[in-house]
Amino acid sequence: MPFAAGQTYLFPLGSQLCHLWIIATEPDENGMFATVNFTSLKGANDQTVIIRAGEHRFVKWDTCVQYGLGELTSTERLQEFVDAGTAKMHHPIRADLVKLIVDGFDCSDFTKRRVREFVQARKTAARSQNG
């Protein structure tokens, strides 16, 4: 299954820690992409980007992006999780929310440096491809 920015998945299935994760960047030439999850706004330390109830069909109450848990992963690894039943693809998010989330990697004090640098490189590559 090809993966793309804006797709979402539930992970890890069967766990109380299961969250909705977002593929934030297009995969690079090695299949690597940045991913980040939504978490409850209540009590969250990082409120850089807030997603309001109803902005995605999974979001039933105000939610925020948890940049501190943002990671780099590969299309191969996500496919392994899907095949093993520990992840399940969900409905994609709107393009404007993807942009907001991607911009938040730079703004959040909680983003890991390697993740921030990867996202910046992917944004630069996307601008180069689009002229």
Where are these regions (language model features)?
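A near-ubiquitous, low-amplitude feature marking generic local secondary-structure context
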Residues: 4, 50, 80-84
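Compact nucleic-acid interaction/catalytic patches
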Residues: 12-13, 17-58
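A short, polar/charged loop/turn motif at coil->beta-strand junctions and beta-hairpin connectors
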Residues: 3-5, 29, 59-61
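C-terminal terminal-subdomain/extension
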Residues: 55-131
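Generic structural signal for residues positioned in beta-strands
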Residues: 8-10, 34, 50, 64-66, ...
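Short coil-to-beta transition motif at edge beta-strands of beta-rich domains
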Residues: 2-12
